[in-house]
A protein has these predicted regions:
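A polyanion-binding, active-site-adjacent surface
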Residues: 1-117
Length: 117
């Protein structure tokens, strides 16, 4: 059964888009980007942007959008056992619509990839 990713987190003034591959099992269960307990994303972003990575998820997202950073994933859906990018079944990959996203978010000037796929 295909896994479905999340909607992007972005406001109209976002300048940087950080892309993962596809949310892991814990993230999908929690309904939150980078929710895995060993994931270093929030501690690193907290250090970089000067916020407490333990603050509630909604506030962390607010810190990101306030800093002009958008979050999304490369894949809209896929099939995968577990959470590893290496386990994604290539023939099931459905990419997100980046052309439409970038048209709507015309201030994006850079895209960073935070995944292996």
């Amino acid at each position: 059964m295909p896994l479905a990713g999340f909607a992007p987190v972005a406001d109209s003034q976002a300048r940087l888009l950080i892309l993962g591959s596809m949310p892991g099992v814990r993230s999908l269960t929690a309904g939150q980007y980078y929710a895995g307990p060993r994931n270093r994303f929030w501690p690193l972003m907290g250090e970089f942007l000067g916020f407490d990575p333990a603050m509630p998820y909604g506030r962390r997202l607010g810190e990101m959008t306030d800093a002009g950073i958008a979050l999304w994933d490369v894949l809209q859906s896929c099939e995968r056992e577990g959470s590893l990018d290496a386990s994604i079944v290539e023939s099931t990959e459905v990419p997100n619509d980046f052309a439409a996203f970038l048209e709507k978010h015309s201030h994006i000037r850079a895209i960073a990839f935070n995944g292996q796929k």
